[in-house]
Design a protein with these regions (language model features):
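Conserved beta-strand elements of the Class I
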Residues: 13-15, 38, 367, 390, ...
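Beta1/beta-strand and adjacent pyrophosphate-binding region of the FAD-binding site
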Residues: 6-20, 358-372
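Second-shell loop/turn segments in exported
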Residues: 15, 55, 73-78, 131, ...
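Flavin (FAD/FMN)-binding glycine-rich loop and adjacent Rossmann-like elements that form
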Residues: 3-6, 49, 61-62, 101, ...
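Conserved N-terminal/central alpha/beta ligand/cofactor-binding core
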Residues: 3, 9-11, 29, 35-36, ...
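N-terminal Rossmann-fold NAD(P) dinucleotide-binding loop
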Residues: 23, 375
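Structural detector for internal amphipathic alpha-helices that build alpha-solenoid repeat scaffolds
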Residues: 736, 741-753, 759-772
Length: 772
């Protein structure tokens, strides 16, 4: 990684890393003393311990000793996820604590003496720095502590205890399950009641890599799922065996939580660094008790007050640079990323990041970044063709907006081909008379579809990591050789022969240097979006009530805050903004509105689409300004060529879905879920073929790919003989000019070639005579 400058977005007294309830308690307690505090959470919600690991119950003897604890657990019944998330969020807002969702701490800043001076975070907007005096590391595995080089006990491979909670189904048995406890209260939503089962597993943890934890997570999901399940933990709950080396280890059993010495939570060799998590140097049995939400809220509050007092008179370091390890490394290429300031008003200068190296977390034939509507299909397809495939997904389920986004009902779209296979297979997971079988076509229970994708991928030999965000690309010249990722364990590189960018907004292609188009520079037009409600068993809560740029982390965080107010009283909300427009890569070809309306054909068609112009807002193409679609729901069929999925100037990478190369007003016709599932399959198949034949996507025999796609029903047979469109003839243009005064008939032909249109129209006007 070459030297670079990281934009600074804030300067505060204290950074709290992590979005657990204990992290919020510490941040608020520090803020109440007058400290300026910034909290960074990597999930799209707060309370990752309670909501993420499903710890809504209080154990016997857990007393609500803080005001925040009493707000979170107001009665005997389990609180709802939305209550937890909004209560914690309100605490931060009411006490002027700045915070961001969906952001990973990837690096730390240090002053010239090596003391902490801030953090670097990664999110959909790129990477930014926050300067500070001190850090509370409230991550589950003390990952920030590791970035600073704090001493810790060595990792010992072996059996580890994991807890995982499911809602709705019956307890399962397996050799790895040592306990399956049905909790005292079911989850009640309206008139429905769902049992809750907490499993305890004993499973081997091979090493301290994120890959090993991801493997354990998939094993646990395999052992516990059935068709009656309506919810489950996002995050495994476990107490790591490895602890930090603290100022003073604590080996006792305190008579009260207040007696816990803060020295056991403070790093031994790094000043101004505290650990508020299970990696504190206390007995593992004690950590299992005090890191549960209720006790941890008390400890967090105590730590926030203590740290704020200790750093009150310390200045923010005048000099700060990104800490880079001095290591021997292989030169696979350079990392590309986004390093633009979030807002002009937030710009606080830059910090230097010296040249350094990133760990290689794995090497695969095909890597799919994003397991959404297209990405899940792409991963399954590549794996089924024998490619060594890894799918990386930020959320803890596959399917994206079609599942976790609660858009579980098709609108338009071509439903043949691989999509027909998905649809039939998902509904076949349960008997036809199962009470959750949907009424009507094109409807799919979200958790069934998520599980179908997951099992199909794993059964095909693919690997799956949840909780991972793409934050850059590894490039050598014009060749993309891998993806830079942020995980809860830190930042690293995953090498690929072919990288499929299924982020939905071409995040990785843009980080690699690809040009893109989006709202802002030319127009303020953006399609309407939503952030809908969710409750167990739901699969369709589509809505359109806000505008949001889901590549702007400030805007996304704002949308989640706004949604919680709008949805007060609901059980929960979605974990992904329901957006319809995102960044679109500039590919070898850009699909226009005229291509769609004129049914343009291509020799390299990769996916077939059917939809209306489902625009949800302002349109900007001159054709629509003059002649908007007359019928609300007229269906157009459109081809998408491979060229639109190939970022211009880059090799070894393809983009899918909403990140494809198309005009914003053409995108509504080619973004329907059924079509994108087919597109994902096609891209996965093509990528695996590229690996087998050692060819780039531009060099592959597209007819070979098309023949397979025609065979399975993805493409109409005509694509095998379709020719390149050479443009409309002069006679066709003249005919269109003659008819354009009749309610703009032929305008879609004329606007394909504005210069020729003007020439021919000018001649006709010059030769016209005024009627007497």
């Amino acid at each position: 990684e070459g030297a670079r400058k990281i934009p600074v977005i804030a300067e505060v007294d204290l950074v709290v890393a992590g979005g657990s309830s204990r992290a919020i308690a510490a941040a608020v307690a520090a803020a109440k003393t007058g400290s300026r505090v910034y909290l960074v959470g990597y999930m799209p919600y707060l309370g990752e311990d309670i909501c993420g690991s499903h710890l809504y119950e209080r154990e016997a003897g857990e007393k609500l000793q803080t005001a925040l604890a009493r707000k979170l657990f107001p009665g005997k019944n389990f609180p709802t996820p939305l209550h937890i998330k909004k209560t914690l969020e309100d605490e931060l807002i009411d006490n002027n604590v700045q915070f961001l969702y969906s952001s990973y701490v990837t690096n730390v800043l240090t002053d010239p003496s090596g003391k902490p001076a801030g953090v670097v975070i990664a999110n959909r907007s790129g990477r930014q720095a926050i300067r500070c005096k001190a850090i509370i590391d409230a991550t589950h595995n003390a990952s920030v502590t590791g970035l600073l080089g704090a001493e810790r006990k060595p990792f010992i491979a072996g059996s580890q205890e994991f807890c995982y909670t499911v809602v709705g189904n019956t307890p399962k048995e397996a050799p790895e399950i040592i306990q399956a406890e049905e909790l005292s209260q079911p989850i009640k939503v309206g008139e429905k009641s769902y049992p809750v089962t907490r499993y305890t597993f004993h499973l081997p943890l091979k090493d301290d890599s994120y890959a090993s934890l991801a493997e354990v997570e998939q094993i646990i999901r395999n052992r516990t799922w059935d068709i009656d399940q309506v919810d489950s933990s996002d995050l495994l709950w476990y107490i790591p065996k490895q602890t930090i080396n603290s100022e003073k280890a604590y080996n006792g059993n305190p008579v009260s939580w207040r007696k816990l010495p803060m020295q056991a939570f403070k790093s031994k060799n790094i000043a101004n660094l505290w650990v508020l998590g299970p990696c504190a140097e206390i007995p593992r049995e004690l950590a299992a008790k005090v890191m549960r939400p209720v006790p941890a809220l008390f400890i967090g509050e105590m730590m926030g007050e203590t740290v704020a007092r200790q750093i009150k008179d310390i200045p923010v370091p005048a000099q700060a640079t990104v800490r880079q390890l001095k290591v021997n490394a292989s030169n696979y290429g350079q990392t590309g990323e986004l390093l633009s300031p979030l807002r002009p008003s937030l710009q606080k200068g830059f910090v230097d990041s010296p040249a350094g190296a990133l760990p290689v977390l794995g090497s695969y034939d095909v890597v799919v970044m994003g397991g959404g509507t297209a990405g899940a299909s792409a991963g399954i397809s590549a794996a089924k063709q024998g490619a060594n495939t890894l799918v990386l997904e930020y959320l803890h389920g596959l399917g994206g907006l079609s599942t976790l986004g609660m858009i579980g009902v098709y609108w338009d779209g071509f439903r043949g081909g691989y999509t027909a296979h998905i649809d039939k297979s998902v509904l076949a997971m349960a008997p036809k008379d199962h009470p959750r079988q949907p009424k009507g076509e094109g409807r799919f229970p979200a958790d069934w579809k998520m599980e179908w994708h997951r099992k199909e991928l794993l059964q095909a030999g693919g690997k799956l990591w949840f909780g991972v965000m793409g934050c850059g690309a590894l490039i050598e010249g014009s060749q993309v050789k891998g993806v830079v990722v942020a995980t809860p364990f830190g930042r690293g590189v995953i090498l690929s022969k072919i990288l499929i960018d299924s982020t939905g907004s071409a995040d990785i292609a843009i980080a690699a240097g690809a040009a893109f188009d989006y709202t802002g520079k030319k127009t303020i037009a953006v399609q309407g979006a939503g952030t809908g409600k969710w409750a167990p068993g739901d699969y369709y809560n589509n809505n359109d009530w806000l505008f949001v740029d889901d590549t702007d982390i400030l805007d996304v965080s704002r949308a989640f805050v706004q949604a919680k107010t709008k949805l007060q009283g609901q059980y929960d909300l979605v974990k992904i903004p329901q957006t319809r427009e995102r960044r679109r890569v500039i590919g070898d070809y850009i699909i226009s509105v005229y291509d769609v309306i004129n049914h343009r054909r291509y020799p390299d068609t990769i996916s077939y689409h059917k939809s209306s112009f489902d625009t949800h807002g302002m349109i900007i193409d001159p054709l629509f300004i003059l002649n908007p679609p007359e019928k609300r729901h007229k269906i157009y069929d459109a081809d998408v060529p491979l060229r639109c999925l190939l970022p211009k100037g880059l090799e070894g990478i393809l983009t899918t879905g909403l990140g494809a190369s198309a005009h914003r007003d053409a995108m509504p016709v080619i973004r329907m879920q059924p079509c994108l599932q087919n597109q994902g399959y096609a891209v996965g198949y093509l990528s695996a073929l590229c690996v087998k034949e050692n060819k780039s996507p531009r060099k592959i025999d597209i007819k070979k790919v098309q023949r397979h796609l025609v065979k399975i029903g993805n493409l109409p047979e005509r694509v095998l003989t379709d020719k390149e469109f050479k443009g409309f003839s002069n006679s066709e243009m003249k005919k269109a000019i003659a008819s354009v005064t009749d309610n703009y008939k032929g305008l879609e032909i004329l606007l394909t070639d504005p210069e020729r249109c003007i020439q021919l129209a000018s001649k006709q006007i010059a030769g016209a005579t005024m009627p007497e």
